[in-house]
């Protein structure tokens, strides 16, 4: 079966999310994160890992990328956001994903609740592969595309900046930021990683990365590698301590801008809990206005939502019988009478 898909957009910044938590982020005509059409494995997107430091057990806030069976799991799609509810080993996670209508950013808010009767110490680790290039160019030669991406860690803001160096004088520069903010709770120092090899490790995948294995040396911090790396990623880790019944909210924010100054301005803005809160309200208002502008009902929106999976992923079940296809002798203009541009 094809993945269920939800699309979130403000017209410039676009996010696709599947029911398992995979997907992509795009800005204008650029791929922000790496993605390949793979309806079976679906291992691409922006992810968040949770690890119990006392036991070494880890899982993700959605089914992807760890593929571990949760005690309870629910994916909820609405016009303005995507939600995931999950329970693992008496730890509840509730994730909301939305795109801001006023800035080119996506907000992933995760509320983590300790439902056990003991104090828990957890690692929260974000992860995404950064591209900032045309999707076709990255798909043809990803290793070459990676050579132009440079990363910079900003410890004072708990953020990572990435930029794509221009290949010629006429090429514009693009900037990306990746931020993790803990709301109302001090977790100590954050750690960072921008080298995929050091995060995943040799012979591993995103379901069992090297970075999620407890260190025998006792240090669980990421390496802090930055600069011109061969395979750029963005990953931030924070440690949280939760008493029984206690909750903490983690905001993971990513976005794009044309200059470094604008990017730092967005980082500063979305570290503020009140400004981040506005994203969900604005996204809901934007989705309602969009439906009204195109004269669509909620029933129409639900129909489009069911069809979008077959647009993003090739659906062989919709292909007609080969004998009928062979009989067709019309060109693209034959579609115009059905209001299809082709």
Stretches found by the model and what they are:
Residues 1-342:
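Anionic coordination/interaction segments
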């Amino acid at each position: 079966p094809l993945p269920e898909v939800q699309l979130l957009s403000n017209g410039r910044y676009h996010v696709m999310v599947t029911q398992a938590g995979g997907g992509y982020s795009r800005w204008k005509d650029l791929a922000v994160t790496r993605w390949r059409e793979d309806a079976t494995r679906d291992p691409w997107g922006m992810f968040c890992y949770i690890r119990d430091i006392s036991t070494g057990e880890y899982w993700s806030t959605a089914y992807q990328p760890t593929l571990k069976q949760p005690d309870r799991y629910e994916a909820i799609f609405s016009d303005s956001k995507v939600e995931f509810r999950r329970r693992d080993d008496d730890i509840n996670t509730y994730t909301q994903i939305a795109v801001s209508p006023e800035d080119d950013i996506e907000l992933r808010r995760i509320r983590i609740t300790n439902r056990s009767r003991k104090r828990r110490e957890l690692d929260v680790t974000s992860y995404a592969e950064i591209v900032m290039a045309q999707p076709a160019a990255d798909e043809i030669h990803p290793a070459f595309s990676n050579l132009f991406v440079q990363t910079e860690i900003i410890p004072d803001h708990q953020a990572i900046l990435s930029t794509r160096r221009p290949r010629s004088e006429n090429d514009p520069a693009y900037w990306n930021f990746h931020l993790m903010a803990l709301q109302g709770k001090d977790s100590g120092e954050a750690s960072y990683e921008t080298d995929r090899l050091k995060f995943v490790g040799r012979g591993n995948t995103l379901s069992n990365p090297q970075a999620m294995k407890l260190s025998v040396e006792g240090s669980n911090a990421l390496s802090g590698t930055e600069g011109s790396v061969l395979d750029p990623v963005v990953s931030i880790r924070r440690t949280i301590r939760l008493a029984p019944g206690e909750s903490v909210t983690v905001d993971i924010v990513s976005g794009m801008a044309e200059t470094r100054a604008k990017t730092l301005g967005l980082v500063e803005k979305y570290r503020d809990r009140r400004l981040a809160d506005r994203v969900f309200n604005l996204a809901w208002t934007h989705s309602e206005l969009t439906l009204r502008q195109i004269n669509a009902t909620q029933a129409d929106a639900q129909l489009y939502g069911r069809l979008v999976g077959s647009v993003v992923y090739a659906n062989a079940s919709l292909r007609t019988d080969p004998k009928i296809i062979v009989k067709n002798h019309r060109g693209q203009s034959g579609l115009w009478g059905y209001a299809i541009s082709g």
